[in-house]
């Protein structure tokens, strides 16, 4: 079978050329020492071990490091030095020639972006059937990465997009979507032309040229392909060409009895490995499928099911913790790269040092987030971007150094929260205006001024100059010690950023600053930082590294379907049938590769070792996962038991046990009894004494860091301000003209909005402002009608202070009206809740299950049963005015969402008996507050109405150790 049907590259076929010989290394023994021994065959230790004329091809860079270590150990055992061989991964066999003007990644991205933004979409409807919402630089850059990825995939066989069209020339096979590939080829042609205009060549084009015209590296006399079960197809083309000049040895990590399971290049044969049973410990004896070789091995592989990624990581950490010195005794394989962050976190929590040889993407580093925040402020200083920068630890450290003793992190962050929640600023300019109104020397005002200066610096010059100046300003006062791990990492990241900026600056001629930032950040975030391996640390090895792990105990996490075997699903351009046709690595070849790796790492631990395979039931996002299909490779008789084993319920780990609080919290007692309480505070105490304590005594309350619109309190305050202005304005006091009143209220509302939020409003605020206009417009009609009937506002926003139960109760009465003819008085409170509620229903509730904890003083026996006071607002207003207006009525002026329900609703049934009961309740509440009685809590508050719900998962009583409580 040909590796590739295309004649242009003339890729080698199996069997391999005569000068390519296979050799087998026993998989019962560790691979690296065997390889070192094989490579040094014939060396007697008389001189240094000289392998410098040897080229060794290994699957990964980490396996290359393992090989060099093994060679050094072998030479050192005889007290000799070693000259290491040249070690390459398969893709390096046809790397682009340095003498060619190969384009950098920024240059390639920008060339594609230019082509995509200049093209006429009508010419490429097979590729772009729908028009983009905006053909912006961001859109083009995302697509550029997609096309570079497609080029890289085709580059595995040394092809370009136009080469795919050659498949349509033969009658034996029809190329699917030929018009689409023709348009893709035209786009690639324009891309190549764009690079040529700049004196550059695409990296994949250069690699394809190198694969077609290979030259044996100078000084190399022999090539060894070592335990590489999945080489790139184009690398085999290069090796076949090399084989005409020098010998090539293929070292297969398997016994010679498995020779028929591999092709001439040492690749597992799909027809063999897809039928190879894999034994599990505790399973029935393995019955081979028809025609498959017998598998008479006692498995050392144990399978454990875990609920989720954290459970897998905890189990792996527990296995490693069983060794006093795990390095060298236990190996950890990570088949699913998505598990790496949680693995590192859990192992760190357990104080087990780990090392990820693949490194970490810089997108997770503090410098990347600082740069991203600077870029956002430079591009468009929205307040969300300002907040992101303001909360960066490096920026906070800068403010501390810049402002000195005047700076407080708490004041800075809490001030930003107050600014967002109180003023909803849209951008930096409006935030500075509002902060300045609070005080020019406030921490927030000074900090925002520093951000404004950084924004000016960033916009003043080029990307390179602006970024360097901004970072220089931020870190100017910081002393770095490169012996400290954190400082050394920051310095390394800064060097990497400088290199990226230099590349982008050289390539990004004509780009706007914001586009340059986007390009540089995208490239910087994708770069990888590699660290030195800490002494004694456990390596977190990728799946392809596991053949080289020689620890007797190996634990592999994430062996779920889709990860092992690795699967390609839903490729937009290269479906599985096309991949197989052109010789790309397919799902079938990956299945064979991974089946072989699993079998080899199990065989390597027979006779005293152990292999633990950990599977997840769900992903980090909660999506269900299936066990790897490799674990279902067994005979028909065993299949039911195997399914039961792999799909059983996962064992409970420590984190899966039902949550319970480790200890109950002990809140501090009040420093001194409260002397004042707001009218609304009594309502809060009646709802829950303990939550009153949290809010009114400790001053606790939630902060919404994502607040984008007014909450109910903000909306009510806004409407109140407009209505208060109407009541206080001399011209409006006696006005009975509804349009005039409506116009005044709209003006007063607009003035209040500008005062609080500025002239530039976010969209949600604009919508809420329109709702307020509609409600106030209807209120103007009601007000005009009431005035025509003889009612006038006597006083607005009257302050009250009354002594009850040894406490001073304070508040504000929204308005007091008097009738011109009758002299009757009414006390009204504005209500802007979405639904209009009658005063009685707002103050009293029928006794029931949810009121079982109500105090006796809050109860009222009525003809319709026992009622419970839940609010005392209107009764307290009447009590405050009792001497001045003993016959006053009370009620609400409702301004609900349904403007048709707008109107004045009096408490018609209010009586002296109700008032006396309300005052008894007020005396009881104030006495309880004065005595520090804030227990027990109410546990029947709906979670969506409870601002402290997140603190008490099983209720407040189960979470709090209250003083003197049972």
Q: What is each model feature region?
A:
Residues 660-966:
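RecB-family 4Fe-4S metal-dependent nuclease core
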Residues 1-733, 746-759, 767, 787-791, ...:
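Polyanion-engaging groove/track-forming segments
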């Amino acid at each position: 079978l040909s590796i590739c049907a295309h004649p242009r590259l003339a890729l080698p076929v199996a069997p391999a050329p005569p000068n390519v010989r296979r050799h087998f290394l026993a998989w019962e023994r560790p691979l690296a020492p065997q390889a070192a021994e094989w490579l040094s065959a014939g060396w007697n230790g008389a001189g240094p071990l000289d392998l410098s004329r040897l080229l060794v091809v290994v699957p990964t860079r980490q396996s290359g490091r393992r090989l060099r270590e093994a060679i050094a150990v072998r030479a050192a055992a005889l007290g000799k030095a070693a000259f290491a061989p040249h070690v390459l991964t398969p893709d390096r066999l046809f790397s682009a020639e340095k003498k060619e003007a190969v384009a950098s990644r920024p240059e390639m991205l920008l060339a594609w972006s230019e082509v995509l933004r200049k093209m006429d979409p009508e010419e490429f409807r097979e590729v772009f059937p729908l028009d983009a919402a905006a053909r912006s630089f961001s859109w083009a850059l995302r697509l550029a990465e997609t096309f570079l990825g497609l080029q890289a995939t085709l580059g595995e066989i040394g092809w370009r997009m136009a080469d795919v069209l050659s498949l349509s020339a033969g009658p034996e096979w029809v190329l699917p979507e030929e018009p689409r590939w023709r348009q893709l080829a035209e786009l690639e042609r324009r891309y190549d032309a764009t690079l040529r205009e700049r004196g550059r060549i695409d990296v994949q084009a250069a690699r394809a040229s190198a694969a077609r015209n290979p030259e044996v590296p100078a000084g190399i006399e022999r090539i060894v392909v070592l335990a590489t079960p999945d080489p790139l197809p184009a690398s085999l083309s290069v090796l076949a060409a090399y084989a005409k000049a020098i010998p090539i040895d293929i070292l297969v990590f398997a016994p010679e009895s498995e020779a028929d399971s591999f092709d001439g290049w040492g690749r597992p044969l799909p027809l063999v490995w897809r039928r190879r049973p894999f034994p599990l410990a505790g399973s029935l004896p393995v019955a081979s499928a028809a025609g498959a070789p017998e598998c008479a091995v006692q498995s050392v592989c144990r399978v454990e099911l875990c609920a989720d990624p954290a459970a897998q990581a905890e189990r792996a950490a527990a296995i490693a913790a069983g060794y006093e010195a795990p390095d060298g005794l236990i190996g950890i394989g990570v088949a699913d790269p998505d598990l790496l962050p949680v693995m590192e976190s859990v192992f760190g929590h357990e104080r087990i040092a780990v090392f990820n040889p693949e490194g970490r993407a810089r997108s997770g580093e503090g410098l990347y987030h600082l740069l991203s925040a600077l870029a956002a402020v430079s591009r468009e200083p929205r307040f969300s971007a300002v907040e992101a920068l303001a909360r960066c630890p490096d920026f906070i450290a800068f403010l501390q150094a810049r402002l000195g003793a005047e700076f407080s992190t708490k004041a800075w962050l809490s001030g930003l929260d107050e600014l967002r929640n109180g003023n909803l600023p849209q951008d930096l300019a409006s935030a500075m205006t509002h902060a300045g109104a609070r005080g020019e020397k406030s921490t927030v005002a000074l900090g925002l001024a520093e951000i404004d200066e950084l924004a000016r610096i960033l916009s003043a010059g080029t990307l390179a100059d602006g970024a360097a100046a901004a970072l220089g300003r931020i870190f100017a006062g910081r002393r770095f010690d490169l012996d400290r791990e954190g400082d050394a990492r920051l310095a390394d990241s800064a060097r990497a950023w400088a290199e990226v900026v230099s590349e982008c600056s050289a390539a990004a001629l004509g780009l706007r600053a914001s586009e340059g930032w986007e390009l540089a950040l995208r490239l910087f975030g994708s770069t990888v930082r590699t660290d030195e391996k800490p002494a004694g640390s456990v390596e977190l090895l990728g799946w392809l590294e596991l053949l080289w792990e020689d620890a007797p105990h190996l634990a592999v996490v994430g062996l779920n379907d889709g990860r092992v075997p690795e699967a390609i699903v839903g490729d937009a351009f290269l479906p599985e049938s096309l991949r197989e046709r052109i010789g790309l690595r397919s799902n079938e070849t990956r299945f064979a590769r991974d089946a072989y790796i699993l079998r080899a790492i199990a065989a390597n631990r027979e006779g005293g070792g152990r292999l633990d395979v950990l599977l997840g039931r769900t992903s980090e996002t909660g999506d269900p996962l299936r066990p790897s299909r490799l674990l279902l490779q067994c005979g028909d008789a065993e299949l039911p038991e195997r399914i039961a084993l792999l799909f059983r319920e996962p064992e409970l780990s420590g984190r899966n046990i039902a949550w319970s609080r480790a200890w109950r919290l002990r809140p501090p007692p009040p420093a001194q009894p409260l002397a004042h309480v707001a009218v609304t505070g009594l309502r809060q105490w009646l709802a829950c004494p303990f939550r009153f304590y949290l809010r009114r005594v400790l001053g606790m309350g939630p902060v919404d860091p994502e607040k984008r619109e007014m909450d109910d309190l903000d909306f009510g305050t806004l409407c109140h301000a407009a209505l208060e202005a109407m009541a206080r304005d001399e011209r409006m006091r006696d006005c009975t003209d509804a349009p005039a009143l409506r116009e005044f209220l709209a003006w007063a509302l607009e003035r209040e909005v500008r005062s609080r939020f500025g002239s530039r409003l976010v969209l949600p605020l604009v919508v809420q402002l329109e709702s307020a206009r509609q409600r106030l417009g209807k209120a103007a009609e009601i007000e005009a009608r009431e005035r025509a009937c003889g009612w006038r506002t006597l006083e607005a926003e009257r302050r009250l202070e009354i002594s009850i139960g040894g406490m001073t109760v304070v508040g504000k009465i929204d308005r007091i009206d008097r009738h011109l003819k009758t002299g009757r008085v009414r006390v009204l409170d504005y209500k802007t809740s979405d639904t209009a509620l009658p005063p009685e229903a707002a103050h009293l509730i029928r006794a029931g299950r949810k009121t079982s904890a109500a105090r006796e003083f809050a109860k009222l026996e009525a003809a319709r049963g026992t009622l419970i006071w839940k609010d005392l607002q209107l009764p307290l207003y009447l009590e405050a005015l009792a001497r001045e207006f003993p016959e006053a009525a009370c009620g609400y002026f409702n301004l609900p969402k349904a403007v048709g329900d707008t109107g004045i609703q009096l408490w018609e049934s209010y009586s002296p008996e109700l008032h006396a009961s309300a005052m008894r309740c007020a005396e009881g509440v104030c006495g309880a507050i004065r005595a520090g009685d804030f227990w027990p809590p109410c546990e029947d508050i709906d979670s969506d109405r409870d601002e402290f719900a997140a603190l008490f998962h099983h209720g407040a009583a189960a979470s709090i150790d209250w003083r003197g409580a049972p």
